[in-house]
């Protein structure tokens, strides 16, 4: 069973210590109540991962741990087989002792679009909401973050993260907690808060933006990435049923509307720094994610539309600063 004791000990000595009033009970309840049928199998796979000195670790330009020479052929096949227990791998990629985990998403491309526009992460406390397998947590550590905390309720993402951390020498600069943002108290402690690919899944986008704000210290930075449509300040797409075969898509604003929402929630210096059409090179089926992917969600006769006839996925990156309360 995954143990969060190291995280408790870590935050007891820093600005997140007040989180200990609620967090241990929440995670104890999660461990007790989580009934995902595959969790025992994933835990067994985690426990079977061999101890291998990480040696070379590269987190700045990519996530690469160790080298192919660190493992013999038989051991490498064993490790790859164990890592495949955690399929589908959606967010990455990762390279572990010469094993390339080719994930569905090229999350490194998103990072390359975001990084030039954000404040330097060196020495910062960072929160990544909806962090998936934690790929971007490692890139944040690679940029010098003092502590990178990710939250995502998926037990599979937690196990994927712990598998990578195992090979990274149990690095304690990054942590993933199986929680949703609605379960966090108003910590007001992070220098930077990321929410990437989450807003359109929320029934109340304004509430989500306010929840993000409540995690930031005064003058902290919000990095918000989400689906957008073309249009003016009052244009918002609300799918009648599905968007790209996803049922849980609620609001897709124009970039102008998104900017207004964030300003109304008490942020200043709000700016859209990037817009990008998602391509089938960035999101695609791979040997590590064999289910449907973006090409299956687009109209086969017109890739500018989803199969439902909505505009194809376009993503914007917004940066903002929390005004003082």
Curated annotation (Swiss-Prot):
Enzyme's top EC category: transferase
Gene3D superfamilies on file: Vaccinia Virus protein VP39
GO BP term (any one): tRNA wobble uridine modification
Keywords, in A-Z order: Transferase, tRNA processing
Entry EC number(s): 2.5.1.-
Catalytic reaction annotation: carboxy-S-adenosyl-L-methionine + 5-hydroxyuridine(34) in tRNA = 5-carboxymethoxyuridine(34) in tRNA + S-adenosyl-L-homocysteine + H(+)
Ligand binding (carboxy-S-adenosyl-L-methionine): 91, 105, 110, 130, 152-154, 196, 200, 315
Example of a GO MF term: transferase activity, transferring alkyl or aryl (other than methyl) groups
Quaternary structure and partners: Homotetramer.
Protein family per UniProt: Belongs to the class I-like SAM-binding methyltransferase superfamily. CmoB family.
Function noted in UniProt: Catalyzes carboxymethyl transfer from carboxy-S-adenosyl-L-methionine (Cx-SAM) to 5-hydroxyuridine (ho5U) to form 5-carboxymethoxyuridine (cmo5U) at position 34 in tRNAs.
This protein's name: tRNA U34 carboxymethyltransferase
Organism: Aeromonas hydrophila subsp. hydrophila (strain ATCC 7966 / DSM 30187 / BCRC 13018 / CCUG 14551 / JCM 1027 / KCTC 2358 / NCIMB 9240 / NCTC 8049)
Lineage per the UniProt record: Bacteria, Pseudomonadati, Pseudomonadota, Gammaproteobacteria, Aeromonadales
């Amino acid at each position: 069973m995954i143990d969060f004791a190291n995280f408790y000990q870590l935050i007891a000595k820093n600005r997140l210590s007040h989180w200990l009033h609620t967090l241990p009970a929440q995670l104890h309840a999660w461990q007790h109540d989580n009934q995902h049928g595959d969790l025992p199998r994933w835990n067994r796979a985690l426990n079977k991962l061999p101890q291998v000195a990480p040696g070379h670790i590269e987190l700045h330009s990519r996530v690469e741990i160790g080298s192919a020479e660190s493992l013999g052929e038989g051991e490498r096949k064993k490790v790859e087989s164990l890592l495949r227990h955690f399929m589908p791998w959606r967010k990455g990629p990762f390279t572990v002792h010469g094993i390339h985990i080719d994930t569905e998403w090229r999350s490194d491309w998103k990072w390359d679009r975001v990084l030039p526009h954000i404040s330097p992460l060196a020495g910062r406390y960072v929160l990544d909401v909806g962090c998936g397998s934690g790929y971007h947590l490692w890139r944040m550590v690679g940029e010098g973050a003092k502590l990178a905390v990710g939250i995502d309720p998926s037990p599979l993402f937690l196990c994927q993260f712990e598998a990578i951390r195992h090979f990274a020498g149990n690095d304690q600069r990054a942590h993933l907690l199986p929680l949703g943002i609605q379960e966090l108290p108003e910590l007001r402690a992070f220098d930077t808060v990321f929410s990437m690919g989450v807003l359109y899944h929320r029934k109340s986008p304004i509430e989500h933006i306010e929840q993000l704000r409540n995690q930031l210290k005064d003058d902290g930075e919000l990095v918000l990435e989400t689906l957008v449509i073309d249009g003016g300040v009052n244009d918002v797409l609300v799918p009648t049923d599905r968007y790209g075969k996803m049922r849980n898509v609620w609001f897709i604003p124009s970039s102008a509307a998104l900017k207004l929402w964030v300003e109304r929630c008490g942020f200043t210096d709000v700016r859209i720094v990037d817009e990008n059409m998602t391509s089938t090179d960035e999101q695609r089926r791979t040997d590590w994610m064999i289910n449907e992917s973006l090409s299956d969600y687009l109209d086969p006769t017109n890739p500018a539309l989803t199969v439902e006839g909505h505009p194809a996925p376009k993503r914007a990156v917004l940066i903002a600063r929390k005004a003082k309360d």
